[in-house]
Amino acid sequence: MDSPLAIIVLAAGKGTRMKSDLHKVLHPIAGRPMLMHLMASAAELSPARQVVVAGHGREQLEKALGGSADIAVQDPQLGTAHAVQQAQGALSGFEGDVLILYGDVPFVRASTMRAMIERLHGADEPAAVVLGFAPADTLQYGRVIADDGRIVKMVEHKDASEAERACRVCNSGLMAVRSADLFGLLARVGNDNAQGEYYLPDVVNIAIADGRTCAVVVTDDADEVAGINSRGELAEAEGRWQQRRRAAAMADGASLIAPETVWFAWDTVLGRDVTIEPNVFFGPGVTVGDNVTIHAFSHLEGASLAQGVEVGPYARLRPGARLEEKVKVGNFVEVKNAVLHKGAKANHLTYLGDADVGAGANIGAGTITCNYDGYFKHRTVIGERAFIGSNSALIAPVRIGADAIVAAGSAVSRDVADGELRMVRAEQLVKPGWADRFHDAMKKKKAEKKS
């Protein structure tokens, strides 16, 4: 494809069925707004221009896009053809191909987009290329009546004859058109219909009436053009995405003990021979090395796990957690913005926040890095091979030296030197026989109350 490409994404709908203050196309699937799934696929075609047509929630879209696309505004919303017209200003001076997509149809593959553009440059030079699909139930969809891939006409279901309804190729709404043709055709679209709106498929019928060829490309996967208009459809889309990602993970060498209970993010990276037990959740930003085991009920986000790491069960890795080779983070351990160097262990009931844990260090059960003073975060540094006894509080900023030992139950607020033992406890009080006398006195008092 030598011709420059522009992408128009229609996202002006109110999304009323979502019943949400968040713009419909910004609802996440696998931890990523559905619009950004679509934009990422489109980016594989290296478009020269990108325009998102917004209406309701424009400010949210601008923030999410961060300047990566121009924003055109459709107000009022008068149909899909009218929406595309609003991009004309943003495409002023552009000469090339235009691909029209929908923000609530997020899983169109780059290969499908590419096939549409390639068909636009076919020998018969079609004026427009429509993406068709064959759903299991064609009842609600307009039909693409075609002969050998050339469109005869586009017809809405309610207007179709019985013979036309027998056609299984339906209109996805996606279209590829040359910029030289697009806006001239749009200007001729009327609104003589029950809704009084301007519909994009009419572009095809107008071009055909002019004697131009229009073509259809039919996807082999109806799910890729499934629209999302409600919370239920959002959940279904999430389920389909997760099912495919799980299958891909296992095909790439990961073992998922109960695949249907594992939830991945859009950018999860897994190495070879990774074992994932049931009910594990990956948020965005997780990279897992080879030969890692993640035990049941663990929650990971923004974390990197090197080769041979073992996590969980019931562990939580938060953003900034970095576990180097052979690290063990066990049950009910939380790690945030902390590095555990090679072979370090925190096996149970521990919080490590804003910490640097040296290679081979052992963190006992119940250890807490006290990293927040109510205003600022502070860092704890634990040296190589240090041993932190159970139920210890390390009050940051503090440094524990290499090979040092912190006795169980200590609250450490000053640095500990290399090889030092630090014990910070109140002196034990011993009173022989006191408990016996206490019990005797209480029993006597209880008996007196009953009498």
UniProtKB/Swiss-Prot annotation:
Alphabetized GO MF terms: glucosamine-1-phosphate N-acetyltransferase activity; magnesium ion binding; UDP-N-acetylglucosamine diphosphorylase activity
Assembly description: Homotrimer.
Family: In the N-terminal section; belongs to the N-acetylglucosamine-1-phosphate uridyltransferase family. In the C-terminal section; belongs to the transferase hexapeptide repeat family.
A GO CC term attached to the entry: cytoplasm
Recorded name of the encoding gene: glmU
A GO biological process held by the record: lipid A biosynthetic process
Name of the featured protein: Bifunctional protein GlmU
PROSITE patterns: HEXAPEP_TRANSFERASES
Active-site residue list: 348 (proton acceptor)
UniProt pathway: Nucleotide-sugar biosynthesis; UDP-N-acetyl-alpha-D-glucosamine biosynthesis; N-acetyl-alpha-D-glucosamine 1-phosphate from alpha-D-glucosamine 6-phosphate (route II): step 2/2; Nucleotide-sugar biosynthesis; UDP-N-acetyl-alpha-D-glucosamine biosynthesis; UDP-N-acetyl-alpha-D-glucosamine from N-acetyl-alpha-D-glucosamine 1-phosphate: step 1/1; Bacterial outer membrane biogenesis; LPS lipid A biosynthesis
Annotated region described as N-acetyltransferase, given as residue ranges: 253-451
Main subcellular localisation: cytoplasm
Organism expressing this protein natively: Novosphingobium aromaticivorans (strain ATCC 700278 / DSM 12444 / CCUG 56034 / CIP 105152 / NBRC 16084 / F199)
